[in-house]
A protein has these predicted regions:
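Vicinal oxygen chelate
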Residues: 1-3, 9, 32
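Short beta-strand His + acidic residue motifs that chelate non-heme Fe in jelly-roll/DSBH
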Residues: 2-4, 22-23, 43, 49-56, ...
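Short, conserved beta-strand element in jelly-roll/cupin
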Residues: 5-22, 64
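A generic "binding-loop/recognition-motif" signal
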Residues: 8-9, 19, 28, 47-48, ...
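Short acidic-glycine-tyrosine-enriched beta hairpin
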Residues: 26-45
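Double-stranded beta-helix
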Residues: 52-86
């Protein structure tokens, strides 16, 4: 996907199927986390992030956003570490 940063929304993910990676950068620390079934991660507001599928199986996860999504101006696309495929 395209690398993104949210202005006010925090996200929490729980991976259901597939295998992937997520890059997160909060300005002080940058990391890549492997996403496999059972993995839980958080993406605090203001954190740059980008994820990708690294298997032939769809990457499926539950995403909870808090507070509720305020509108189109919430997400800003940025330059990530991987070339987006969608």
């Amino acid at each position: 996907n395209k690398a993104t940063v949210h202005a006010t929304v925090n996200e929490f993910w729980y991976v259901l199927e597939g295998r992937g990676e997520i890059w997160r950068d909060n300005g002080a620390e940058s990391s890549i986390t492997v996403l496999v079934p059972g993995t839980s991660i958080d993406i605090p507001a203001g954190t740059s992030f980008q994820y990708r599928n690294v298997s032939g199986v769809d990457l499926k996860f539950i995403c909870i956003a808090m507070p509720p999504w305020p509108g189109d101006s919430e997400a800003t696309f940025i330059k990530g570490i991987w070339e987006p495929t969608i």
